[in-house]
């Protein structure tokens, strides 16, 4: 694509490789080696290139505007590693230093200057991983995500975050030890304020300086792939930092943001919203995400704050209705459809995940049926209900038992991911451990029960760092995790439990093979509110099944009976109350044979001891012939709720 064609397609919103044209690029012009700098500022009066190579003199290197509003200059003064900015004379004559929106590196905070960088071509060694990803996809594969804030998983003795070179040496072995299938990073793009956690971005094409060089993150991803771990990154295409020297009103007029003040300003987050209907902004954002997938071989993208992009009244502030008088942001709706269409056409095996909390729009449905085309949607309703239930005193749980059963009424309305994310362990919400009811023993028991329920419930999984070993304090983004907690035997046992639970998930296909239809689950009993016990069966494609029973109160139930559709000899393969995990049971239940007898709509029964505040999972060891093997008729009732 020549320069003029690149500009034309930029203006029509069809240039998805914009970073190869705009920004700083090494070139040879008339036999002279140097760098060409280009920036889009259509309404600026003048733009000058300034940096280390001009001693920051503002008028030394003027740039020339073309017919498309892009300013350009070639210079042999700039060298690799030099810091630079653009000195923009805005439409009103006001002058301001601005970042290069297409830079691939920036200086360390509090500076915001771009660094002249030509990304080296990496010789990747993850071909086997990519081939498997392409062949297997992810819909019928285990997806169990460890969510990480790269700046606070661990820190150096001086308080600085680990670089990706350090994370490669320590975090990847930890992921392997803990048996996760994927890691998801909170935003890694350049951001001016650490306290934003990366959700108010400045440089969309650049790795945050504090995390090291781009090559270090490439090596990290490659090493993850070597160990069969996928890498997902959060991305924020809805809003950006309001800082004057970043994207905000770049040339003095709305450039990346909306013209309409109500649509442009996000009062709740103190940010600016992208004009998602503007062609140039669409080119910018889609180019950004393709850059991250191509340069870093990412396996998934989680799109943050989708509701903010879809609803004009999402912010608790004055808002402007759409042309039909409603609150749907048509620009955001059509942009998200187009984004997923473009990404899926080129990268069908890269996961697109939406963090979205409403239920009005089909998020994971295809464009043809009015959906947005995402692969997965965070199930925020399930998460809120289940946490509320587990925080409650067990005495009252029978009155709110619908909090754990309601999800079965809509479980396949979307393709869901079940998140216990960073948002649930900050701002006074308490850590996952601290949320649990009771004394310290019961809190650990409740957490083991909860995590087992998450693993057994249909949907992909996500857990925020520190939650796997029961950190008691809330997450603090400016400090490392409370690793000293592991000196306590209970926390150490909790960590071991989490690692074994993750392996249990990977080992049993029925827990992930059919995650999007009722073919993968059969409800045994969702009505036992008096005892607060829930039971269901997870099913695989080749007849594998696990019987999952959850006792959600601290009362052991001897001779507990449930009905089953298949006669046989069953063995307990999971019990959250084993002593090695912090419980009091020294061993599993004994193997049990089903008995013929009417139980609800079943004519086979299984009787065993159900541990207090425990989850018990059973697997058929040997099938037995029976003339009275039936399927739960109530299952059709659940299906009819779809």
Swiss-Prot record:
GO BP term, example: glycogen biosynthetic process
The protein's Enzyme Commission number: 2.4.1.18
Reaction(s) this enzyme catalyzes, per UniProt: Transfers a segment of a (1->4)-alpha-D-glucan chain to a primary hydroxy group in a similar glucan chain
Class of this enzyme: transferase
Active-site residues, as the UniProt record annotates them: 304 (nucleophile), 355 (proton donor)
A single GO cellular-component term on record: cytosol
Pathway(s): Glycan biosynthesis; glycogen biosynthesis
Example GO molecular function: hydrolase activity, hydrolyzing O-glycosyl compounds
SUPFAM superfamilies: (Trans)glycosidases (SSF51445), E set domains (SSF81296), Glycosyl hydrolase domain (SSF51011)
Keyword vocabulary terms for this entry: Carbohydrate metabolism, Glycogen biosynthesis, Glycogen metabolism, Glycosyltransferase, Transferase
Subunit: Monomer.
Role noted for this protein: Catalyzes the formation of the alpha-1,6-glucosidic linkages in glycogen by scission of a 1,4-alpha-linked oligosaccharide from growing alpha-1,4-glucan chains and the subsequent attachment of the oligosaccharide to the alpha-1,6 position.
NCBIfam families according to UniProt: branching_enzym, PRK05402.1, PRK12313.1
Similarity section: Belongs to the glycosyl hydrolase 13 family. GlgB subfamily.
Protein name: 1,4-alpha-glucan branching enzyme GlgB
Organism, scientific name: Streptococcus pneumoniae serotype 4 (strain ATCC BAA-334 / TIGR4)
